[in-house]
């Protein structure tokens, strides 16, 4: 939330505010305690249990605006079939699940990535996407400088790992949406989207 606030993209305080943000800037972040205070309370029991509960997993399956495409990042690769199966049971039109950076919806560009894509109740499409970078090591980021995000977005910083992560994640999303017929086409389209981005967007939002 601190990062979004820094970038001029404050969290939504209600469903109505989230909808307005999506209409205005095609992006919104709504905290779980706003979407479902009860689920937030259950997650906050983690210190009591001493471990995560299934609530952490199924909370990610919530789709409050009935988006036709969902993206799911997980940490443990052995659970991809479970999440794909849940999407089919819930009738989610399209969903992708993959092992993301730190369990987030963020493709790791320095490693091959297995992606499970579901469409309705059909059997999942399982693809292994190649690494986008030759160096298998992720560069350390001890400073966690929020201004670096702006510099990368505006093209003022040549951060190969960050750009590859963004473009790679966009590519998986495009493939999941049915906008690309292959991994190669998805990555080409994603590169074009990144190159054509509005580099002043974050400044305007702030």
Where are each of the predicted segments found?
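Glycine-rich anion-binding loops and their surrounding alpha/beta cores
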Residues: 5-12, 17, 22-206
